[in-house]
């Protein structure tokens, strides 16, 4: 270096090829090597000379890689389930969360469209139906059972009276007894969330299947949040898919340890560990719960996740939840949550916020890179609690923050 002063640092600390033999001596002169406790500068130089790098994961890169790997692994169900050959084609898939049920539904629906056929996809949850509709190709019908019922009732002569206490019983009776127009018969019928269907719903949907059509019934007993009995499907071929490819293995292991899996679940995710954090609040302290939820958002943002990567899932239903009735948690944390109202076309109305917030009931069937599972509180860990924990925790693809009461934490620790 011709003029070391131009470098902006002490010229005595600049070494080049001609003075490389002085490297060790300069370091010893500059750093307190003899000190019992070397300072921060000494540690930095040691890490530099030892080629030690301070790295942190890039969530944006991990999200893309995780989605690609999980899709590839879980795609096996969609591939070989559709290679099965029997007639009539009536396939019941009992599959755990993250086993590829959605990919199978997408593959079957898309193949029907490509073949010029008319498919029907029916699930329980409206949010899941809206989510799947964005993934499916144009054509056919993608609905929740209640959307299907509403459309049928309107086509038969008028809008249902949703003010009546027995409105759904009336609609079910109408769908069971009314003649079925040809326009309501489908070549392919796919039922998702079958564990939430009743026998009456089964009969209503399956009467829409053409005689030589294909039918696939997808269900997960571990996600039975409504306590329904398993619907009998006599004569159907049953296929079990017990590997969860989506949830990090640590989450699957925790759920197995606390007894949240009624049927065995195998961890098949490419990610062994999960970024799991617990934030505790005193039982019954709503303000503390909200404060810990805000802290959970900060933790997710600090880990590099964007607001679009984060979903808030409440352990409570929408009516009993505190968070799901708020427009915001703070000035910077606004919420996008269902208001409980619908427009004239039957579309659900959402608050115009930046962070998605749903109940564990409505978010079933979907997932996000980072999940904040909040308002977790229970006096006794019964089967419903275990199923809600299973559903909520398996929504997370990379990071999971549990916001739970102190009494809920004690019961979890007792089981682990």
Question: For the regions a protein language model found, what residue spans apply to each?
Answer:
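Conserved helicase motor core of SF1/SF2 NTP-dependent helicases
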Residues: 63, 69-82, 86-157, 168, ...
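Short glycine-rich substrate-engagement loop in P-loop NTPases that contacts/grips substrate
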Residues: 156-176
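Catalytic-core helical/loop segments in enzymes performing group transfer/polymerization on anionic/lipid-linked
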Residues: 43-56, 79, 84
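Non-catalytic propeptide/linker segments at domain boundaries
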Residues: 56-62
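Phosphate-binding/switch loop-helix module in NTP-utilizing enzymes
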Residues: 177-183
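Accessory nucleic-acid engagement/destabilization modules that flank
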Residues: 1-50
């Amino acid at each position: 270096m011709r003029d070391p002063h131009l470098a902006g640092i002490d010229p005595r600390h600049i070494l080049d090829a001609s003075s490389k033999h002085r490297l060790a001596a300069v370091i010893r002169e500059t750093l307190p090597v003899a000190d019992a406790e070397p300072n921060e500068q000494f540690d930095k130089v040691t890490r530099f000379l030892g080629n030690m790098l301070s790295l942190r994961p890039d969530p944006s890169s991990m999200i893309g890689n995780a989605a690609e790997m999980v899709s590839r692994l879980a795609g096996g169900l969609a591939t070989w389930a559709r290679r099965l050959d029997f007639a009539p084609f009536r396939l019941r898939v009992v599959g755990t969360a993250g086993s590829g049920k959605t990919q199978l539904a997408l593959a079957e629906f898309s193949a029907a469209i490509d073949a010029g056929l008319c498919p029907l996809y029916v699930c329980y949850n409206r949010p899941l139906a809206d989510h799947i509709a964005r993934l499916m190709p144009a054509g056919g019908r993608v609905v929740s059972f209640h959307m299907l019922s509403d459309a049928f009732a309107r086509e038969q002569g008028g809008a249902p009276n949703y003010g009546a206490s027995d409105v759904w019983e009336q609609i079910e009776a109408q769908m069971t007894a009314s003649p079925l127009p040809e326009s309501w018969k489908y070549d392919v019928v796919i039922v998702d969330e079958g564990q939430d269907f009743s026998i009456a719903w089964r009969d209503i949907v399956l009467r829409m299947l053409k005689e030589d059509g294909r039918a696939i019934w997808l269900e997960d007993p571990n996600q039975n949040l409504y306590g329904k009995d398993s619907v009998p499907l006599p004569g159907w071929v049953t296929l079990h898919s017990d590997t969860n490819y989506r949830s990090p293995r640590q989450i699957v292991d925790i759920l197995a340890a606390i007894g949240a899996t009624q049927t065995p679940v195998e961890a098949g995710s490419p990610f062994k560990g999960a970024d799991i954090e617990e934030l505790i609040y005193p039982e019954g302290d709503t303000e503390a719960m909200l404060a810990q939820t805000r802290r959970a958002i900060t933790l997710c943002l600090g880990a590099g996740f964007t607001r679009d990567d984060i979903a808030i899932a409440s352990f409570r239903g929408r009516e009993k939840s505190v968070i799901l009735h708020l427009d915001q948690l703070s000035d910077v944390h606004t919420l996008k949550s269902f208001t409980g109202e619908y427009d004239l076309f039957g579309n659900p109305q959402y608050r115009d916020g930046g962070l998605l917030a749903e109940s564990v009931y409505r978010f079933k069937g979907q997932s996000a890179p980072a999940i904040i599972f909040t308002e977790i509180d229970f006096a006794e860990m019964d089967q419903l609690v275990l199923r809600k924990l299973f559903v909520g925790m398996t929504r997370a693809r990379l990071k999971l923050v549990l916001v739970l009461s102190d009494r809920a934490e004690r019961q979890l620790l007792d089981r682990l």
